[in-house]
Amino acid sequence: MATITPSSISNAWLIPGASFTVKKSDCSIKCSFSRKAGKQILSSTQRLVLPLSTSLRLFPTHGRQFVLHPHRRATGTDVVAAVEEQDSTPVVAEDKETVASEKSDAPAPTSQSRGTARPGRKSEMPAVKNEELVPGATFTGKVRAIQPFGAFVDFGAFTDGLVHVSQLSDNFVKDVSSVVTIGQEVKVRLVEADIESKRISLTMRENDDPPKRQSGGSDKPRSGGKRDGSKGGGQRKGEGFNSKFAKGQMLDGVVKNLTRSGAFITIGEGEEGFLPTAEEADDGIGSMMMGGSSLQAGQEVKVRVLRIARGRVTLTMKEEDDGKFDETTTQGVVHTATNPFMLAFRKNEEIAAFLDKREEEAEKPPVETPVEPEAEASVTSAEVEESVCVPAEVTSEEVPSSETPKVVEEEVIATKAEDDSPEKEEQTETLAAAAEAEEVVPPIPETKSEEEIVENSIPPNSATDEVSSPEALASEEVEKEQVVAETPVDEVKTPAPVVTEASSEESGNTATAESIKGISPALVKQLREETGAGMMDCKNALSESEGDMVKAQEYLRKKGLASADKKASRATSEGRIGAYIHDSRIGVLLEVNCETDFVSRGDIFKELVDDLAMQVAACPQVEYLVTEDVSEEIVKKEKEIEMQKEDLLSKPEQIREKIVDGRIKKRLDSLALLEQPYIKDDKVIVKDLVKQRIATIGENIKVKRFVRYTLGEGLEKKSQDFAAEVAAQTAAKPKAKEEPKAEEAKEAVASPPTTVVSAALVKQLREETGAGMMDCKKALAATGGDLEKAQEFLRKKGLSSADKKSSRLASEGRIGSYIHDSRIGVLIEVNCETDFVGRSEKFKELVDDLAMQAVANPQVQYVSIEDIPEEIKQKEKEIEMQREDLLSKPENIREKIVEGRISKRLGEWALLEQPYIKDDSVLVKDLVKQTVATLGENIKVRRFVKFTLGEDN
């Protein structure tokens, strides 16, 4: 609140922080206060006469803020402290615009002095001579400065030209910065150039006629630049700012953009209004507490026209009745609140209406009834709640009372007669404190406001309503204001079970309900964030553990694990297939099932699948899901080995059995995925992690199967002895000298005349085939420069070289995967000779295409026909031989027909025999050979595995 200090000069009041506007030398001087100053208005009896000269001497710092307006007022000079609202930003901007426009029309000497203030002005645009400054001429310039009344453009003339805000566009322009920015290149047209006063007027409008504008401007000479204030002002107010809206009109609008002081609302075709922050529905609480407005761009809002000033429409989201609360505040009626959140509740429309309704019910005269022990206990508990609302200054006053001990003794006897439990003794102490609070309340001074007295007469269930009202009426504010339900609420809640009942069961249920209500929402939210359980589960857990977070977490974990065990019997037909590839050398394909497709697409389930796939990749010893999947033969074999160890021979038979079982269990647990410690938290086992997710999601989850590939496992790399290879290659051979001569002679005879091959043909063939330069040159020379024949020559040579390279050992390569819609997944391993080729882009593309090929062919089960077991081939052959259409055929012909049918049938099961999905004219095996010819290394598709969601293993 702004402080008012007396001054010895003319007995005037000095008001810091106030801005003054002088309407005229003999008019009233108004002092503006912001909302932060308390919104207090001085009454008419407090107006003081202050001469203009004295006021000017008292406030020298505000000398430049005085604006003279020609409207005559009363002859007296009054200082009025008026309540100015925060939505005055547009009006202030208009005043600044008026001042600036008046300054722009100042006399010529002022403009000249302004022009001479910067003689060394440097222009970035080409120089424009004064002879070229003809009205209607078009120039290109850059925006140098932006003012509320227009923009200054540098186009190379002797000074910057002014584009008035009304000349920026053919449409209405509210904000200059929304049309142009500093440094922007714009196209302008000259309206007027006054070389003597060094002023240039420009326009950016396209529909105006320059001669008419010039003739209109030349009707009145610019002698000194003065305006007829009375005529001009009347015309602007009367004609230029006609609005089609009326004060108090309700409109539907859309938020256009947001500023610090408010928001601009589109309320019609081309019409906009300004909504100050203080006129929003929440009184600007969102901007103060959250750091920004509660509105968003594009949001549809319902607004009311608050006022129309100079064509500018100021809007509000409040109803007309909201002003009554401000009037009562300025008249000295102040609500008593125990903390700032109560004030925030009072500013909210819905909560304030609820509190007012409750206060109206409290003001009704109570019905006089005989006080019974139960009623007396409830009344005293209500008095305890009233004492929470009493200010600290009032409760700190100690008023002696001789009747208090007697009342306390009677209440103690009444409560002990009903229940002698320790809880009742604590309640008795609370009642004693309530009785003291009751005696303290009467001496409150009469100067207290009506609102404060009403709050002290809140009914007994007010504390409970205060706890539940943020959840019921303003659920969106509970997270911001959870501190409201902390220590004061807990203190009020403890005497709640004072009302005793005859039945012990009813009292137990009431105590449970009250204990659940007494849990702080902040604790519930914290427990939800830490455990991921439901709100009611967290509430029940906190009530069971009496607010202890650790015990509540243990309670939820036990309950979650128990519910997970119950849900383990449910069927799981949906789920997700995931994959994890580590450095293209370790690959995992995993299937996890759940009950519904909705859960399988959730983020929690996706994260679980990814974590389990990573877990499999991180545990190389894992081979099974659970220990039950291990075959009995392996268990028996392990048991026999353990029983024969020397350290157990000296043990008794019974102890030996237990030791062996423990060792075998430990060994089997190391092979099972669900028994491994979780890699992100080694205190949790994987199966417990799955149970936690079951408790969180509420559906059964099962890890169905997984496959793990390690690059090159099972392959024996050939040990290379370079010394032996070099010695073998350089060893003398008897026929080596004679054979080359014969070959050279044959080549000399058979070689055709050499043709000249151009470098352009070699380059074109290299781009089309990807072969080496010498290979392309030889191919063109052999085919006489024919590109098509050269391509065939290279393809045949490449395939033949690929066949030669197929005998090389391929132990490097890449592991890839492809997941289609999380329902079909493929894990594939493709080998090559060196790691360099395995990391090349061409090889990566081949692996990805082969994985996609395997997904696109559901009947494919093997890599090649040679990988199909002989049992399956024999079975297919027997089936084909027994067909009726072959019984009449001769034996020789029947064999050939069966072989053809079997090869076709087996080709459908082999991946390499399928037509390539991106080019069905090429088989997959031919694609691999082409890649071998391009990369120059042997490539082998070693293995792949395919999972389809829901299929049997």
From Swiss-Prot:
Ranges annotated as biased composition (Low complexity): 369-405
Stated name of the protein: Polyprotein of EF-Ts, chloroplastic
Regions of compositional bias (Basic and acidic residues) in chain numbering: 93-105, 121-130, 201-212, 219-230, 416-427, 735-747
Presence of the UniProt keyword DNA repair in the record: no
GO CC terms of this entry: chloroplast; chloroplast envelope; chloroplast ribosome; chloroplast stroma; mitochondrion; plasma membrane
Database matches in HAMAP family: EF_Ts
Transit peptide: 1-80
UniProt region (Disordered), positions on chain: 93-130, 201-243, 359-514, 731-750
Compartments (UniProt record): Plastid, Chloroplast
InterPro entries for this protein: EF-Ts_dimer_sf, NA-bd_OB-fold, S1_domain, Transl_elong_EFTs/EF1B, Transl_elong_EFTs/EF1B_dimer, Transl_elong_Ts_CS, UBA-like_sf
Keywords for this protein: Chloroplast, Elongation factor, Plastid, Protein biosynthesis, Repeat, Transit peptide
Record-annotated S1 motif domain positions: 136-205, 248-318
UniProt keyword Repeat, yes or no: yes
Alphabetical list of CDD domains matching this protein: UBA_EF-Ts (cd14275)
Source organism of this protein record: Arabidopsis thaliana (Mouse-ear cress)
Molecular function per GO: mRNA binding; translation elongation factor activity; translation elongation factor binding
Compositional bias of kind Polar residues: 458-467, 501-513
